[in-house]
Amino acid sequence: MPTINQLVRQGREVETIKSKSPAMQNSPQRRGVCTRVYTTTPKKPNSALRKVAKVRLTNGFEVISYIGGEGHNLQEHSVVLVRGGRVKDLPGVRYHIVRGSLDLQGVKDRKQSRSKYGAKKPKAK
């Protein structure tokens, strides 16, 4: 606990809040071009082949972003929309690619949580 005199001399340091997705630069989404599409393995104790893409954003940042859902049609030079949001078991992946916008199609035959995966409403029979 500082004395009054110490506070007069030094003052309190204000804690600066660090962004969790700095490449977005306070935008909700950013457009980018895929430079590499590949799979990577998660941290212990999980095991899988997670689909990720390296994306060069319009503001010049190059980020690794996650491709959610089952199956995708991305390849190099695909134009995608990137949003914030990390993947807990993939170190360095702090962004998600938005399904169903620009070059990335929505998940096929998706019935539940469709809006998160850009899937159209199935035809009622």
From Swiss-Prot:
GO terms for biological process: translation. Keywords: Methylation, Ribonucleoprotein, Ribosomal protein, RNA-binding, rRNA-binding, tRNA-binding. The keyword Metal-binding does not apply. The modification 3-methylthioaspartic acid is found at residue 89. Pfam families: Ribosom_S12_S23. GO terms for cellular component: small ribosomal subunit. Gene3D superfamilies: Nucleic acid-binding proteins. CDD domains: Ribosomal_S12. SUPFAM superfamilies: Nucleic acid-binding proteins. This is Small ribosomal subunit protein uS12. It comes from Albidiferax ferrireducens (strain ATCC BAA-621 / DSM 15236 / T118) (Rhodoferax ferrireducens). The lineage of its organism: Bacteria, Pseudomonadati, Pseudomonadota, Betaproteobacteria, Burkholderiales. The gene is rpsL.
